[in-house]
Amino acid sequence: MHIHILGICGTFMGSLALLAKHAGHQVSGSDANVYPPMSTQLEENGIQLIEGFDPEQLKPAPDLVVVGNAMSRGNPCVEYMLDNSLPYTSGPQWLGENILRDKHVLAVAGTHGKTTTSSMLAKILETSGLSPGFLIGGIPQDMGISARLGDSKYFVVEADEYDSAFFDKRSKFIHYFSNTLIINNLEFDHADIFEDLGAIQKQFHHLVRTVPGAGNIIMPSSDENINQVMAQGCWSCQHQFGIKPDDNWQYRLIEEDGSRFEIIFSDDQGVTKESGRVVWSQSGLHNVKNALAAVIAAYQVGVNVSQSCEALSDFIGVKRRMEVIYESQGVTIYDDFAHHPTAIKSTLEGLRAKVGDDFILAIIEPRSATMKMGVHQQTLASSVKSADQVLWYQNAAIDWDMASLSDAIEIPSMIINKLDDLIEATVHLAHSNVHIVIMSNGGFEGFHKKLSNAIKSL
């Protein structure tokens, strides 16, 4: 079967393309902007990429068009597809019907940490010999690829709450029918499609309703937004984690930066049943919590705690999640996907705990739909307190005046609207013992590579 994917370079759709290819289909696809790392991964796997949406790419007609959720009415390919009655479906529906139907699905949902937690869980299952399939919205460096079919009944999927397609406004994760579900956290996001937090909680409760009675739902005990979802009704076994005395699953920090910690599983009387210690290269309390959730999920399919902790101690990480892309002469540049104030805050706090008094420069492109609308502008100022200085990139798509940010931020701050000026300002600050954290959920107009080259030439 020839499958053509519209919006193929998105993290989800690109991963879907790999699964379709590995399942024996001929796969091609197109997108408005084709950029690494996804474009590189697709090309390496023999998947034809077309830049732009000229309808000629649909001649001769493929057997099926898989439509990404970034596609809308008015797109030339979408209009041609509809006018010519080409068979089509959404990415999540194709995944659920063709890949996940006969699997034990371990799904990772929540506002933050989905990609990292999914990668941790896949790493644990792989190290334990379970050879899982997976689809992850990023590229786990431990696996080297964002998706594979696997050789067992287990499948790890990053479960996104964004809508499925222009013709299916349900959240993607409704299509996955999870057996083991992690809900890491829950906050307001995606203001372009959700009116308020309650609208998101409604979708999450729909997700909870799809988990079988014999299934498992894993969540932090202290997240009130999740607790409100569960209060609407839950028919599955719940596993709560945190640091409360009555939490059966707990973490205990050995190092403040989260580079060493313990995981303890106790019975209802507080007697330890299993425990393990993680010593790894990651940092930040958010990653400790991600790890704990992954360990609990793995436990549900037979992996003991010490095995999981041993696997996580070798966890490398995920591309674009505090990925070191340049390191020389005291300058370290990180590429990070953070695009929400909570994620920005936890990432910078983790780095601060790790590097001590070294200079941290945060460079932030408010690129997500929610950020461009200015929904989070009240909390952005406090999210960067752990940095020493912040540079904001205000491109033409941002709908609000970012000047007010500078007044509210306690650290030195600049708002820059030209990429060349941003490179110049960053190079000026690139002295010894500086950590430059680039935060964007897009290609950032090639800024990462241009900056690295500029610093190399000093």
Feature annotation, model-predicted:
Residues 32-35, 53-55, 71-73, 221-225, ...:
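Short, polar loop motifs at secondary-structure junctions
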Residues 1-34, 43-49, 61, 65, ...:
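ATP-dependent carboxylate-amine ligase
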